[in-house]
């Protein structure tokens, strides 16, 4: 074979490789293929290919740019790649997001979801990014969440029940001393917002001048299992402040036991009565092993089964928990709305927290604290991973972080008129309310409730009902909290209208109840 024939064969072979490679990319279209494709160009010494290298690559890149939605996943004290944020990061990746960490973040970052461990409205660059955000973006904090996650605020919020009596210091020092003198048998613990160094003390041994702290009555008759005190963690999500919408994860709960036996009691040994980081997990409690380990029950079902066998009705516990959570948000709504008004937010917002409860031997429930950005790391107890992942999957669905359709389609459908949106149609939210059907709202000014009639509904009311409908469709195992509006009037007109609408929805379909 001559030299000319040899060069011709090499050119034909190179072109063949290019054609095969382009066809392969057309079928697959991944960034891995792009790297393969680029390597072919770089390795080729053929003059036939080299002059198109730059142009071809640029055209390919423009057509195959990374169009994944972007999630900012950050925590100030540790990397988002490990530890506390690991499962959160993984869940975003599982649902198709590109992750941006704090080191990669700038004011020019394009993003869809912001999940920051700390309160993001007061920290830069998060504060500016949120200020410039659009309604299609999602932030994992709500304005004013400190009014219920602050230990001091929560303990001294004067709830009607469910929180042990507490006195804020130093402002209520004299009231505390007066109460303690009249009730000498009461045990007390002093706490602050760090929730650290909790220990039973007499008022004489406390620093009653300490700012941002409080003294709280100790629940001295806790319900025990195998002589161990335990707490119950409820994962809670608020999705709206105006009107107020709050959900709890109803699929399971977190149960944690104290490291040491409660009796014989010793106030100097906090491991007997404080659930700390090194708690005893449920699968090590002898009386619960047959339910949790052998029968593979959930945390909640394990507790229900054991206490049920002891003749206890655990439905009382879960009802009290829902009522207490509802009262916390209802009583703090005014303060939170003031924060919302000051911030003037455009993006969607939600907040995950974990409410921790203890139960006494009479099945009375007491709220201990509400944790902002609760720990979802299974680094200490690997068995908790499935619970944390289920919580995240449910939250992602409820809040619209993950959807059954692409982000582009979601935005497209939402841009349509209400009559043309398959996600939530006007016929999904217009209900056969009696005052609408009986023509009592021919004039839309007859009563505020007339805004729920299809011909009277304004844009803002429609938006609220559409959001509520979509949440209910996507909530999976999240359960909406019912607020006590029988004994307390709804705070705002929006709350009143939503309550009336939800009541009618419940009558038509019990999945709304």
From Swiss-Prot:
The keyword Ligase applies. GO terms for biological process: egg-laying behavior; protein modification process. Probable polyglutamylase that forms polyglutamate side chains on tubulin. Probably acts when complexed with other proteins. Appears to be dispensable for polar spindle formation in dividing embryonic cells, for cilia-dependent osmotic avoidance and for male mating behavior. Regulates microtubule dynamics in uterine muscle cells. Expressed in hypodermis and pharyngeal muscles. Keywords: ATP-binding, Ligase, Nucleotide-binding. GO terms for molecular function: ATP binding; ligase activity. Disruption phenotype: RNAi-mediated knockdown at the L1 larval stage causes a reduction in egg-laying, likely due to a defect in the egg-laying apparatus muscles. This is Probable tubulin polyglutamylase ttll-15. Residues 73-411 form the TTL domain. Belongs to the tubulin--tyrosine ligase family. The lineage of its organism: Eukaryota, Metazoa, Ecdysozoa, Nematoda, Chromadorea. InterPro entries: TTL/TTLL_fam (IPR004344), Tubulin_polyglutamylase (IPR053317). PROSITE patterns: TTL. ATP binds at residues 216-219, 229, 231. Its EC number is 6.-.-.-.
